[in-house]
């Protein structure tokens, strides 16, 4: 069977397996869990202490807690990516075996944060990392046994790259001849023009 929140594909087996785990907790606690997972998806961080307290009554092991967070994260982010409305999501989750009040509770939480979640996912998609800053300097070598001509300029670039949101910037250094720098600059401008057109 195909589901819209899975991109009109079959639901992954691991998600099917975890639906029964979600049914073990109350619908109120499921809603509170969803709000924590949505905070994580929106880049605001997750409170694992709160999650452990919410799942304590169901006597979840650490693997169950992680699986619960993972399945909620998958359902919410996948539904947002595929622009599924909350009524359709509720219906599909009930088809997978999630009790109606649990599905309603999850979908109410999803509906409240659907727009900001889609905006955040759009901003993060197709990004490997972000450029925090660029430093550069040009050196003129007056004489060297390695260079063919005297006074050939060298461009030294220092990029500060943030690999993922919330992580420290890492330096990436490179040295280029003036010719190679001109080629790099032209290609970067061309890429920027193409990205702006996609916009």
UniProtKB/Swiss-Prot annotation:
Residues 130-199 form the COMM domain. PROSITE patterns: COMM. Keywords: Cytoplasm, Nucleus, Transcription, Transcription regulation, Ubl conjugation pathway. Signal peptide: none annotated. The keyword Cytoplasm applies. GO terms for cellular component: cytosol; nucleus; plasma membrane. Its main location: cytoplasm. It is found in: Cytoplasm; Nucleus. It comes from the Eukaryota. Belongs to the COMM domain-containing protein 4 family. Scaffold protein in the commander complex that is essential for endosomal recycling of transmembrane cargos; the commander complex is composed of the CCC subcomplex and the retriever subcomplex. May modulate activity of cullin-RING E3 ubiquitin ligase (CRL) complexes. Down-regulates activation of NF-kappa-B. Component of the commander complex consisting of the CCC subcomplex and the retriever subcomplex. Component of the CCC (COMMD/CCDC22/CCDC93) subcomplex consisting of COMMD1, COMMD2, COMMD3, COMMD4, COMMD5, COMMD6, COMMD7, COMMD8, COMMD9, COMMD10, CCDC22 and CCDC93; within the complex forms a heterodimer with COMMD8. Interacts with RELA, RELB, NFKB1/p105. Interacts with CCDC22, CCDC93, SCNN1B, CUL2, CUL3, CUL4A, CUL5, CUL7. This is COMM domain-containing protein 4. It comes from Mus musculus. The gene is Commd4.
């Amino acid at each position: 069977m195909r589901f819209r929140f899975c991109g009109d594909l079959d639901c992954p087996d691991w998600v099917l397996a975890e639906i029964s785990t979600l049914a073990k907790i109350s619908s109120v606690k499921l809603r509170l869990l969803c709000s924590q997972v949505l905070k994580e998806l929106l880049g605001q961080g997750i409170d694992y202490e709160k999650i452990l307290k919410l799942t304590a009554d169901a006597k979840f092991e650490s693997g169950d807690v992680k699986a619960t967070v993972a399945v909620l994260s998958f359902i919410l982010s996948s539904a947002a990516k595929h622009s599924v409305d909350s009524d359709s999501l509720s219906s599909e989750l009930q088809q997978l075996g999630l009790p109606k009040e649990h599905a309603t509770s999850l979908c109410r939480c999803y509906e409240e944060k659907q727009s900001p979640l889609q905006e955040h996912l759009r901003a993060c998609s197709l990004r490997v990392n972000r450029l925090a800053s660029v430093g550069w300097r040009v050196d003129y070598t007056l004489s060297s046994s390695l260079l063919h001509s005297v006074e050939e300029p060298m461009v030294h670039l220092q990029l500060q790259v943030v690999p993922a949101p919330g992580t420290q910037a890492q330096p990436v250094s490179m040295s280029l001849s003036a010719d190679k720098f001109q080629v790099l600059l032209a290609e970067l401008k061309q890429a920027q023009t193409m990205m702006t057109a996609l916009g």
